[in-house]
Structures are given as C-alpha cells and as structure tokens.
C-alpha cells in the first residue's frame, strides 16, 4: 500500500485542508475487477464524520470510483456518522460532477490552498492539473447523512 500511495500521490502523504494525512495509515476499501486491484479509497472518521482521504481509480469509466464511494458512504452510515465528506481540487472537474450527481454539496472553497500546500508542506505538488488547469484551490463537498 505505501508504494501504491507514493506512486499515485508522489509522496507517502496527501494534504487536505492544510493537514498532512497518510493514506497508508488510514482504513481503506479496495476495488477489484477480475481479481486485479483497480481502485483504493482511504478514509478517516472523527467527530466531523467520515472524510475521504484519497480516492484512486485505475480503470476510468467502469464504475470503480462509484463503487468505492458507495462502500465508503455505507461505512459512514454503519458507523453512525452524520456527515460524509471530502476535499478535491479546482482542476478535478469530472469528479466534481460525479460528487454533485451523488447528492454532495459544495460547502467550502479554500482559495489558494494548493499554492499554500506547495509552498509549505508538499513542494512536489504540480502547478498545472487536469486539462491544463492551474492547480490552486480546494473545494470541500459533503453529504449530510440522516
């Protein structure tokens, strides 16, 4: 798992909302297709709810991410969490659509959060993200669980 995290995130940690988080030390859910690992979601549970720490799909367009999010939401409900949430970046347009179609709402914009993380915590963060979009901001999405 640490090697997978390092390969996908270019370090053994991710930075969400200014906090260093280590996916390999978090509980996780693995997606398999025909016996092959095709996805990983890691999460953290606290008083705020279940936060998705990392989500990686190695096969786009076949429902890996959806299945992992479904399983994580079910885990949040099982643990009695009232909130299922995550942080993504401003360049992650496809995922933003997926999250919102799932009923998640945008609840926070952290303008400049990626610039700050690059400057203070993770200098290896790319400056340009998906589709040539400058990687600058974080967006927080949540689903209230009742």
Task: Say what each PLM segment does.
Residues 2-60, 66-70, 79, 136, ...:
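Acetyl-CoA-dependent GNAT
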Residues 12, 106-107:
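Short secondary-structure junctions
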Residues 57, 86-96, 107-118:
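Conserved beta-strand-loop-alpha-helix junction that forms the acyl-donor binding cleft
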Residues 62-74, 93, 97-101:
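Conserved acetyl-CoA-binding loop-helix of GNAT-fold acetyltransferases
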Residues 76-88, 98:
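Conserved GNAT acetyl-CoA-binding A-motif
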Residues 91, 112-146:
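C-terminal "cap" of GNAT-fold acetyltransferases
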């Amino acid at each position: 798992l640490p090697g997978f995290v390092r390969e996908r995130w270019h370090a053994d940690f991710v930075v969400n909302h200014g906090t260093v988080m280590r996916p390999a030390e978090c509980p996780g859910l693995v997606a398999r297709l025909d016996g092959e690992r095709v996805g990983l979601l890691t999460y953290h549970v606290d008083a705020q709810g279940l936060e998705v720490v990392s989500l990686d799909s190695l096969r786009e367009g076949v429902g890996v991410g959806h299945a992992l999010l479904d399983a994580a939401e079910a885990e949040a409900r099982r643990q009695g969490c009232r909130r299922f949430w995550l942080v993504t970046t401003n360049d992650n347009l496809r995922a933003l659509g997926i999250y919102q179609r799932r009923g998640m709402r945008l609840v926070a914009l952290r303008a400049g959060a990626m610039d700050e993380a690059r400057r203070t915590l993770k200098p290896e963060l790319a400056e340009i993200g998906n589709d040539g979009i400058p990687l600058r901001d974080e967006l927080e999405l949540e689903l209230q669980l009742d």
